[in-house]
Amino acid sequence: MKTKMTALLAMSALVVVPAMAENEGHGNGSEANKPQGFRFFNNRLTIKPYVSLSYTYDSNIDTTHKATSDSIFLVSPGADFTWRGDRWELAGSLWYRYNAYCDYSDTMGENSYGESLTYKWTNVDNASGKGWNLLLAERYAMINQSDSLTANDGRGIWRDRQKVDVSGVLERRFTDRWHMDVQGQYNWLDYKNDTGKYAPLYGWSQYAAGLQAGYAASKWTDLLIAGGYSDYTQKRGKGYRNYSNDSEVWTVQAGLGTHATEKITYRVLAGASWLDYGGHSNADSGWTYSLSANWRMTRQFQLSALGSSYYQPSERSLGQAIKVSSLGLGASYLTLGDKMRLHADISYRHEEIVYNDRYLGHGNNFDEDLLSVRIGADYTLNRWMTVFANIDWQEDWCDDYKQYDYDRFRGTVGVRFHY
């Protein structure tokens, strides 16, 4: 679906907003305190390895109303790389995370790992504005039960899972004002289920395609219109014979964006989506939106926003579809000679049941809200070491099912060694 696809591509840019401020030159002496990495091919290829060590206190490790607490020690090695050409750039990351639970190591997951790649290419002529832009991205992650909405692609659901995202955008700029792009995406989500311990969760595979056209009336105003189609294939389960495992979503949206500004970028689309769930046509329809924005107010201070709404099959029940609405706001500030970065973000996610089979969805027919707030700081001691700390508050509430409500507090301190 176009809304979700656009949000995922925009997220790759917005998530790194604080990192952009940290990694750029900010005056005399700042370069000496930043990781330089290993450089090859006349500095076109840069590889930056790192190892993070941290301690976390978690007040609710399994995100339930019962609220069982534990302490967690984490070791996370990884590496980031960037390879630049004259008109292209290839960037990627590889990471591993080991969680050692003090009291519940026999039941809680320990290993998470993943990788990501992004390729950008352009031949747009600066004078005429004509040419092509290409963006390709992929990522894989195996994430253990330690789940947070504000970090590591968290979904607010406690369960081991694997996720694959592959996406691409090809844009044609006809002039410095007129442009059009086609988009494609594949997603795969799979949960590890042990029905002897807990109720199953259901993943899917998804194919999506979209088309967007725009006219840049000015650098502040890019008029946009977009349409998209998405097909979900949900994992089957017992009692699912009355439904096809395929669901379809159509989306039409229009809105505004920016074209060539440096300090302020935004993209806001709104429109309508239609859901056909499990072979049942016209299961639901409604308005949807997509939002991404970044405002670099000063060299040190930045604000960002990211949000979207979309339809999808439910993850907690068969015979059920939901509409997800989400919004995240973030801020980042550099101080102490650019050695310290202060950051804060707030994320909200609402899941509304829009289709429910009374038999298959029994006990799961409730809307759910998840709110997460995080504040943190990191301080670069030198080019080899950074210390960091953050606190994370998460609250979940479910309409008419108060036994599923929970809140969660996490506090983390750690050190990151880098080169």
Set out the residue ranges of the language-model regions.
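Cleavable N-terminal export/targeting peptides
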Residues: 1-31
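Gram-negative and organellar
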Residues: 21-419
